[in-house]
Regions:
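Class I S-adenosyl-L-methionine-dependent methyltransferase catalytic core
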Residues: 2-32, 70-76, 86-148, 152-335
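Short secondary-structure junctions
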Residues: 35-40
Length: 335
């Protein structure tokens, strides 16, 4: 009989009480969506000495691959081996397991960037992971992946994915958002002594502007920003390459479902066109405005998208605050 190793993982701490329940709501789903899921048993949320932990058992000893994947979870913090007792000492007893997620740029890059309507950076990391886990590239290193946010706003998705190690590209129609994001990248890299090369260009035929950043010296990542219409994403991102993942948080300023449906109706076919086969899109939205069934029907109209609605992807709805009482997440694969 194969022995098991019991693990207790702290929930990721949140900077704001506004998001205090975020990890509690989503940590189990993130773990069960990951490549680790087939090796896990008895996954449950519990409390040890008044602190919340996600507890589970792993078949056999904990491996380096286990630790690498656990360290990359957005909703988990410190990782511990859990003992009911050791010798005559009764538990629960915790043994810390060294686990760190390497960052290409400091993880505070996403946290430092402040702007109106910003999406929580821990949740953004979660979205990136859920897209990756649903794709054919779930076990790939982030350094091998390209991530696009076609509604990037102030850039939280870009900076989260860049920190993980991906090449990134973002589009937004708001001039202030894009220009201030380009300025922030330049200032942040200068202040943190991160090598940076940049170029700005005009795409006159498309009525758009692009900023191209090369971040790093020997180990380089690309960051492309585009001021333009997300519905023309394949044209605007020419030269970036087809992304493995598309990750975005749909705008909450849309007060009625019809404009949101119109936006997605215009954009989804182009997004599917540029996504690599086996890639995935993950997006969140205010589901009090447009319910999950209606959103699934909308995405389902794009023949090349296969909606991932198996557990745990079908239970990602959660409360955000008094304004957004219910936010949901939908993930779809590119056939």
């Amino acid at each position: 009989m194969t022995s098991t190793t019991k693990i207790a993982a702290q929930l990721a701490p949140q900077r704001s009480t506004q998001y205090s329940n975020l990890a509690r709501d989503l940590a189990e789903a993130e773990l069960l969506a990951s490549p680790l899921a087939p090796t896990l048993q008895d996954v449950s949320l519990g409390s040890i000495a008044g602190q919340d932990y996600l507890q589970f058992a792993v078949q056999g000893p904990l491996t380096g691959e286990h630790i690498r994947l656990l360290a990359g979870m957005a909703m988990l913090g410190g990782i511990f081996e859990l003992f009911d007792s050791i010798g005559d000492v009764s538990g629960p007893l915790l043994r810390p397991i060294p686990a760190a997620c390497p960052a290409f740029v400091p993880q505070d890059m996403a946290a430092t960037r402040r702007y109106k309507g910003k999406t929580n950076e821990t949740f953004t990391h979660f979205l990136c992971n859920m897209a990756k886990y649903a794709s054919d590239f779930g076990r790939e290193e982030w350094a091998a992946l390209d991530v696009v946010d076609p509604l990037c706003g102030g850039g939280t998705t870009l900076f989260s994915a860049l920190s993980l190690g991906a090449d990134v590209a973002g589009i937004d129609v708001d001039r202030t958002d894009i220009e201030s994001t380009a300025t922030f990248i330049t200032q942040y890299c200068r202040e943190n002594r991160i090598p940076l090369a940049s170029k700005e260009e005009r795409l006159r035929k498309l009525g758009a502007r692009r900023w191209l950043f090369q971040i790093g010296k020997d180990d380089v990542r690309r960051c492309m920003l585009v001021l333009g219409d997300a519905g023309r994403a394949p044209e605007l991102l020419a030269g970036f390459g087809r992304p493995h993942l598309i990750v975005t948080d749909l705008p909450y300023g849309i007060q009625h479902s019809a404009p949101l449906q119109g936006l997605l109706g215009d954009c989804l076919p182009g997004w599917a066109e540029m996504l690599l086969p086996g890639g995935a899109i993950a997006f969140s939205w205010d589901s009090t405005r447009l319910g999950r069934e209606a959103m699934m029907a909308l995405v389902g109209k794009v023949a090349t998208f296969e909606i991932v609605d198996r557990p745990p992807y079908d239970r990602l709805a959660h409360r955000v605050d008094r304004v957004i009482k219910r936010r949901d997440v939908l993930v779809a694969r590119r056939r």
